[in-house]
């Protein structure tokens, strides 16, 4: 990848970053093309799919991170995602950078109607999809809030100030772009070094199907129940073996080894118990003296 003149060389993407963007299909656009997104398209495939220029994707990620880092209060940055694939990504981004997250349906009036309970006055908005988050972007334009958005080749760019060209329809591409953006913000703030790796895996930003999580929990519970049942059955079998007298001779010898008076008990069992009290003296005579 050729070095960019838009920012210092230290901010250039590494080979690993480019491989991650390609592996997550961030370069795969749609068949439709918005005229203002034409500058971000590298070429058009034979099947009509537009290929996004990954170099420009990285440049816009760095630009967006530098804009976010200039906001003094991280809570004044509002990240929005109406698309389910971006819910987990925006929540993780907010947790790591201190931003405010709106995951799910955007309530109309959040940025314009001060009477509503959820009224907010952010200084910057980051949207996952300009089409799905159109209401949030429209309200931001009313109150002059700058907007950063993840834009596909067919995304409308009305009221979008900074467009990050990427595939905003795949859960892997959405999660990876949010992860790269969070990492770059933390690096610019000094929380991370550029030479060290971030201990947060990119998988933490990926969408997970709730049904898949339930299936994993059910499988884990079933495995624990099976292990407990096996332990109970083994203990019951050992108890039955002891009750039936089927104890190994070596085990019995080891258990009874060193016991005192073992033979005396056997002799006392065969003797006459009535003769034991005959050897005692007359206690009444002793008391009379």
From Swiss-Prot:
Record-level GO cellular component terms: cytosolic small ribosomal subunit
Coiled coil: none
Organism: Schizosaccharomyces japonicus (strain yFS275 / FY16936) (Fission yeast)
Compartments reported by the entry: Cytoplasm
Alphabetical list of Pfam families matching this protein: 40S_SA_C (PF16122), Ribosomal_S2 (PF00318)
Biological-process GO terms, alphabetical: cytoplasmic translation; ribosomal small subunit assembly
InterPro entries in the record: Ribosomal_uS2, Ribosomal_uS2_C, Ribosomal_uS2_euk, Ribosomal_uS2_euk/arc, Ribosomal_uS2_flav_dom_sf
Primary location group: cytoplasm
Protein name: Small ribosomal subunit protein uS2C
Role noted for this protein: Required for the assembly and/or stability of the 40S ribosomal subunit. Required for the processing of the 20S rRNA-precursor to mature 18S rRNA in a late step of the maturation of 40S ribosomal subunits.
Alphabetized GO MF terms: structural constituent of ribosome
KW NADP (keyword) present: no
Domain of life assignment: Eukaryota
PANTHER family linked to this entry: 40S RIBOSOMAL PROTEIN SA
Alphabetized UniProt keyword annotations: Cytoplasm, Ribonucleoprotein, Ribosomal protein
CDD domains linked: RPS2
Assigned protein family: Belongs to the universal ribosomal protein uS2 family.
Subunit structure: Component of the small ribosomal subunit. Mature ribosomes consist of a small (40S) and a large (60S) subunit. The 40S subunit contains about 33 different proteins and 1 molecule of RNA (18S). The 60S subunit contains about 49 different proteins and 3 molecules of RNA (25S, 5.8S and 5S). Interacts with rps21.
């Amino acid at each position: 990848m050729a070095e960019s003149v838009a920012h210092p060389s230290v901010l250039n993407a590494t080979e690993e970053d480019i491989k991650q963007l390609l592996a997550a299909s961030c370069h795969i656009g749609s068949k439709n093309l918005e005229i203002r997104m034409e500058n971000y398209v590298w070429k058009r495939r034979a099947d009509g799919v537009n290929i996004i220029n990954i170099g420009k994707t990285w440049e816009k990620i760095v630009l967006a991170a530098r804009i976010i880092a200039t906001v003094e209060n991280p809570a004044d940055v509002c990240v929005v995602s109406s698309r389910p694939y971006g819910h987990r990504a925006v929540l993780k981004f907010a947790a790591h950078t201190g931003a405010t997250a709106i995951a799910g349906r955007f309530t109309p009036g959040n940025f314009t109607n001060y009477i509503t309970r959820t009224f907010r006055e952010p200084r910057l908005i980051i949207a996952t999809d300009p089409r799905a988050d159109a209401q949030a972007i429209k309200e931001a334009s009313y109150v002059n809030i700058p907007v950063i958005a993840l834009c596909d080749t067919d995304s409308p760019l009305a009221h979008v100030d900074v467009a990050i060209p990427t595939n905003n329809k795949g859960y892997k591409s959405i999660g990876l772009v949010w992860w790269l953006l969070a990492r770059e913000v933390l690096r610019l703030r000094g929380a991370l070094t550029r030479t060290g790796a971030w201990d947060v895996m990119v998988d933490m930003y990926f969408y997970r199907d709730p049904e898949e999580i339930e299936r994993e929990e059910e499988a884990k519970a079933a495995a624990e129940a099976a292990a407990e049942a096996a332990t109970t059955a083994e203990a019951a079998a050992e108890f039955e073996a002891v009750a039936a007298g089927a104890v190994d001779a070596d085990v019995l010898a080891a258990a009874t080894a060193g016991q005192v008076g073992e033979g005396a008990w056997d002799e006392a069992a065969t003797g006459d118990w009535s003769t034991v009290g005959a050897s005692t003296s007359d206690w009444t005579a002793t008391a009379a003296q």
